[in-house]
């Protein structure tokens, strides 16, 4: 079994090492591909066996990013049995029990491409301390927010073309209930706040701004904190935690997929607040 992982970065001093550690353990570091927009923080300077592809840091264009990553993924599936394609704060994790690891899933699961159940890792700031990135992440975080917008088709054996944001694609999404994507963007208040400053300082292309691509990356600080930390803390503190069962959401997700001009658009407005099962909290 030969599998690869592909990501796209700029100054990801926290998330990129976690991405390399996780996917490197599953696929081998020589099978990881990092597209680097000329990072300046040293995070891409000494990547060892990881393949670094440097591109010019022009004004960030979400459409160009999607096209570049699609083209790279299309090429890599000619040489690998499967390819993971996504941002470096997105870790694809199988249900621990049926599968021992992501490598085990790729080796044994029957799929041509697969859509993950998307879970945003939460930092409940009045219950949980600051994250120690040198220790297992999920052992330090209990809660997650299911979001239909993060149910991404990230793992594939066949070529895929994505729209900006990598949410929508040219194949009908197919969720596997045994495959999750943990989005670590909000796993820690301090880390996320520093990352949001980098995002807000980024120059965006006219096309991305006119289409409102990546709007959440440009949130002001107050809105960013409210939506990602204060609101989740209020929900969890009030005891509004639901069972770790997404049957209802998956049914609505699949029914809500719309095809437009050869691309499949997913519902973006479904949420569920859950406690991460102990077995999954050993994943990374």
PLM-predicted stretches and their roles:
Residues 42-85, 93-94:
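Active-site-proximal specificity loops/subdomain of glycosyltransferases
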Residues 7-18, 38:
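Active-site beta-to-alpha loop of glycosyltransferases that engages the nucleotide-sugar donor
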Residues 29-39, 54-56:
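Short beta-strand/loop segment that forms part of the nucleotide-sugar
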Residues 21-30:
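Short, acidic, metal-binding catalytic loop of nucleotide-sugar glycosyltransferases
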Residues 65-67, 94-284:
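Catalytic-site signature of metal-activated, phosphate-bearing donor transferases
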Residues 30, 81, 89, 112, ...:
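Conserved acidic residues
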Residues 2-4:
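Cell-envelope/extracellular polymer assembly enzymes that use nucleotide-activated donors
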Residues 37, 86-88, 95:
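Active-site acidic Asp-centered loop
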């Amino acid at each position: 079994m030969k599998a690869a992982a592909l990501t796209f970065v700029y100054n990801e001093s926290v998330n990129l090492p976690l991405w390399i550690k996780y996917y490197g353990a599953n696929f081998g570091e020589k099978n990881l591909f990092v597209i680097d927009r000329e990072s300046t923080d040293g995070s891409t300077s000494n990547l060892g066996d990881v393949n670094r592809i440097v591109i010019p840091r022009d004004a960030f264009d979400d459409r160009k990013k999607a096209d570049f990553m699609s083209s790279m993924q299309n090429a890599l599936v000619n040489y690998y049995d499967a390819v993971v394609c996504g941002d470096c704060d997105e870790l694809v994790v199988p249900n621990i029990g049926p599968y021992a690891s992501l490598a085990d899933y790729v080796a044994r699961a029957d799929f041509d491409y697969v859509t993950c159940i998307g879970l945003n890792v939460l930092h409940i700031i009045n219950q949980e301390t600051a994250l120690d990135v040198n220790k297992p992440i999920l052992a330090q975080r209990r809660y997650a927010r299911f979001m239909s917008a993060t149910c991404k088709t990230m793992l594939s054996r066949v070529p895929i073309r994505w729209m900006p944001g990598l949410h929508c694609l040219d194949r009908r999404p197919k969720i596997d209930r045994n495959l999750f994507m943990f989005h670590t963007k909000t796993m820690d208040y301090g880390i996320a706040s520093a990352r949001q400053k980098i995002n807000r300082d980024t120059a965006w292309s006219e096309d991305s701004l006119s289409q409102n691509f990546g709007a959440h990356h440009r949130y002001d600080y107050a809105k960013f904190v409210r939506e990602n930390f204060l609101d989740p803390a209020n929900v969890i503190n009030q005891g509004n935690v639901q069972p770790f069962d997404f049957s209802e959401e998956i049914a609505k997700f699949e029914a809500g997929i719309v095809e437009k001009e050869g691309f499949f658009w997913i519902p973006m407005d479904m949420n569920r607040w859950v406690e991460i099962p102990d077995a999954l909290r050993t994943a990374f």
